[in-house]
Curated annotation (Swiss-Prot):
It comes from Halalkalibacterium halodurans (strain ATCC BAA-125 / DSM 18197 / FERM 7344 / JCM 9153 / C-125). InterPro entries: AceGlu_kinase-like_sf, Asp/Glu/Uridylate_kinase, Uridylate_kinase, Uridylate_kinase_bac. Allosterically activated by GTP. Inhibited by UTP. Keywords: Allosteric enzyme, ATP-binding, Cytoplasm, Kinase, Nucleotide-binding, Pyrimidine biosynthesis, Transferase. It comes from the Bacteria. This is Uridylate kinase. Its EC number is 2.7.4.22. Pathway: Pyrimidine metabolism; CTP biosynthesis via de novo pathway; UDP from UMP (UMPK route): step 1/1. It catalyses: UMP + ATP = UDP + ADP. Belongs to the UMP kinase family.
Amino acid sequence: MAKYKRVVLKLSGEALAGEQGYGIDPEVIQSIASQIKEIVELDVEVAVVVGGGNIWRGMAGSAKGMDRATADYMGMLATVMNSLALQDSLENLDVQSRVQTSIEMRQVAEPYIRRRAIRHLEKKRVVIFAAGTGNPYFSTDTTAALRAAEIEAEVILMAKNKVDGVYNAEPSVDVNAKKYTSISYLDVLKEGLAVMDSTASSLCMDNNIPLIVFSIMEEGNIKKAVLGEEIGTVVRGSN
């Protein structure tokens, strides 16, 4: 039986690119859709927030002289492309889903309306939140934290493609990097650990929303996280 009834799954854009590193890998997105279907079948209400880093990064554009707000809006549009691709993969598996965007584009998706999103979840539809918060200067991690608070999700599942949890140093650089099984948001902020940005961490901490950081690369990990099995790192309001 699932430990959580309502979850927000945070997917990085890079996770959708697979080994090619750019764009959308159809096999990878199909695998993720299959894993989402597994937890929907456990009667879990699933909302998804997708990043856009596989197509465009606002910070990268800004660093090269582009207006930051313009670069961020481009990033939001990239998340819409990813969200539509994920919706298509879910529908191919007969999983009902809805894309809701923070920036209105009614021809392709619903506008974000909190009560409607909750109603979709109650009807066991997967709701994919796209276009970030709709505001520049906010990351999709912050979107995940904000939407989790709004829909009263019990946990955020942060699926990573390069690490399998939270470490005290970059494991790809430091062979002695130590993985935490659990850590508090306060310690994450104090130590400047690269889990999510400080705005997102603070929002989760203030609203007491736990976070499970794990690897998306191993199939079945989303289900393990939902079942409450020991996986990755759990970040809580207090340890």
